[in-house]
Amino acid sequence: MNIETARMVIRDFTINDINDMQDILGDAETMKNCEPAYTIEKTADFLQKFCIEKGGAVAAVHKETAKVIGYILFNEFGEGVYEIGWFFNRAFWGQGFAYESCKAVIDYAFDKMNAHKVFAETIDGIKSVNLMKKLGMKPERIQRSQTKDNFGNWADLYLYGILSEYRQ
């Protein structure tokens, strides 16, 4: 995948992205709704096996700095149905980079891959849900106390999706 937006380049990962990925995955605040912050070894393993070998995620590169500031999980869940997810470097939160990058990937899915649906899920009921709504996704279900957060507390899981005929 190679997509260019006004401020971002969405591309496949390389092993050279390790330090930028560690800045994201090694940050406890970024990872608080997922799992404990990654060690450099765990980041390297995740980058190699999931992002590069499996192609399970793409890099969101900030054009101005050439730095990987986010990763976007993007997987085919079923025929014509894709899951998207994201983690961005905390220094770049609140500036529209996640929206710009995810919107580009969703548009690519519908325009180039003939996707029928793209969905996302989160236990963050505020920030991520707000982004899902901004991306045009609609609520599909809330699973109460479905999973545990990074601190071992039960958390609700929010599922949002967008169908090809309802996209912006």
Predicted regions and their residues:
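A general structural signal for well-ordered secondary-structure junctions
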Residues: 30-31, 53-56, 115
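Acyl-donor (CoA/ACP) binding surface of acyl/acetyltransferases
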Residues: 1-29, 61-168
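Juxtamembrane/interface motifs at transmembrane-helix termini
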Residues: 40-44, 52-53, 89-91, 121
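Conserved GNAT-fold acetyl-CoA-binding loop/helix
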Residues: 29-49
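A short helix-loop-beta-strand connector motif used in the catalytic cores of GNAT acetyltransferases and
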Residues: 48-61, 70
